[in-house]
UniProtKB/Swiss-Prot annotation:
Binds 1 Mg(2+) ion per subunit. It catalyses: D-glyceraldehyde 3-phosphate + pyruvate + H(+) = 1-deoxy-D-xylulose 5-phosphate + CO2. GO terms for biological process: 1-deoxy-D-xylulose 5-phosphate biosynthetic process; isopentenyl diphosphate biosynthetic process, methylerythritol 4-phosphate pathway; terpenoid biosynthetic process; thiamine biosynthetic process. Gene3D superfamilies: 3.40.50.920, 3.40.50.970. The gene is dxs. Its EC number is 2.2.1.7. Belongs to the transketolase family. DXPS subfamily. Homodimer. Its cofactor is Mg(2+); thiamine diphosphate. SMART domains: Transket_pyr. This is 1-deoxy-D-xylulose-5-phosphate synthase. Pathway: Metabolic intermediate biosynthesis; 1-deoxy-D-xylulose 5-phosphate biosynthesis; 1-deoxy-D-xylulose 5-phosphate from D-glyceraldehyde 3-phosphate and pyruvate: step 1/1. It comes from Vibrio cholerae serotype O1 (strain ATCC 39315 / El Tor Inaba N16961).
Amino acid sequence: MTLDISKYPTLALANTPDELRSLPKEVLPKLCDELRTYLLNSVSQSSGHLASGLGTVELTVALHYVYHTPFDHLIWDVGHQAYPHKILTGRRDQMPTIRQKDGLHPFPWREESEYDTLSVGHSSTSISAALGMAICAGKEGKDRKVVSVIGDGAITAGMAFEAMNHAGDVHPDMLVVLNDNEMSISENVGALNNHLAQVLSGSLYTSIREGGKKVLSGIPPIKELVRRTEEHLKGMVVPGTLFEELGFNYIGPVDGHDVLELIKTLKNMRELKGPQFLHVMTKKGKGYAPAEKDPIGYHGVPKFDPSHHSLPKSSNTKPTFSKIFGDFLCDMAAQDPKLMAITPAMREGSGMVRFSKEYPSQYFDVAIAEQHAVTLATGMAIAGYHPIVAIYSTFLQRGYDQLIHDVAIMNLPVMFAIDRAGIVGADGQTHQGAFDLSYMRCIPNMLIMAPADENECRQMLYTGHQHQGPSAVRYPRGNGMGVELESSFTALEIGKGRLMRESTACEGEKVAILSFGTLLPNALQAAEKLNATVADMRFVKPLDEALIKQLAQTHDVLVTLEENAIAGGAGAGVIEFLMKEKQLKPVLNLGLPDQFIVQGTQEEMHAELGLDGAGIERAIRDYLAK
């Protein structure tokens, strides 16, 4: 449902940055108020990321007002905070479709708009990309400006500091804006600091500073005195020493909710040469009290009524796989004081809130540092402890070298609890857990498990925790099947699947479906129509070779089913084994195709990709008809 824009008269005048830049500065505070209200009303009707965008309204308006986008390049890190940017860049009327199938992309996306310079979704990539663009902008000589906006969480990642270190070396004209919404230094925000930002970014101060450097370059003692005096002045009111040491001219912190002061500072900084760093203080959830009070809860929201000041409770009473994992941690830690749980900034999403409170000394949130998380676990395993790394499938990609070099080569007992495996839904291409089976299956020493339901997940987590080598349990986003959970733990026999249904077909081609993971109910649904055998394979590595040989000998066609890329996945492993054994048999691999999977609900995407019950049946019938 599109909102009535007549209720937002100032915002109606700024459908594009060109229109925004034509407005007098005096109306911009009113524009920001309307934009914030529009964002709240829009997201509450459609679902999406809310708190981050509420906090970047003034910053977004100021950036588009000062910089000549899209000629100037504006890059948003991750993209959760870019909803105001989408609204101001010609996509206002499409906002009700965001994160929905065939709708607006949840993050800045190059194919969607010329204003989206970089397609994003994962954190900490913006400064590297901005640096590359800034270097090339300097070579083309058209006075193109490049700006990267990065949050205080994303900037903690090593990649961001690698980029800043390089930028300080090559010294291009670029601006990094730190959107700091943690309020850790809020006492430094105010009139004095805004005034200092004006002075330090102003042309007079900059000219004196740069001119003085040239004049005094031959007099090291005096040059050093000037440098130390400047640092002392700035150090009294700003925490920018680190960024100065990396080669940036640091300005801030400034009030990120004073749009007119932001514009003054940005106009000054636009004319400065070399790498610039602007530290902006914002409040996540700004303007909507519940989101200000609970920015984590209002980070991503379902549809809700803003007047109720609370989010609706899920009507699904079945536990999520994330909760199954979190409860396992607590139950296991009660038995094992050497259990150590590690997460790269995904406490809530991975279901670890309860564990972090009940076992704080065994809980480690390493921030957005996937590489470090994996090798931290290595050190703990070497020390004789039992580390578990809780990580999303798409983010484990960022720690792949560490998985091989620091865990698997030494055959260390580190378990990876891989959440969001398979189709994740509304976050689209950057967040689908499409590749983990493919990129792990080729690693020696790995034990890889794919549960069909929540109880199997619980027992596999226990199995992995007991295993004396690297292991992984991969499970999807969302709720379980509603099966009864066994309170006791039972280690599964490694590499053994189980038959769930046996075909009674006496004529025609006999089919066996080998299911890996939570698509098992869909396989059983299709099997009822086809009178097919179904096996819950459980283990991707090692495969249940005896079961595969048995099914190959007693069936005419084998079908593998997985919520992973077909290329290199579990089905590929089945074919490799059959070829090795000279068991030449027709095999149909069903899974994710060779493409990046777009956004949509899990149910919508399963249907579109032919992985629901009807789609599996259809694919098998088509294969048999060939």
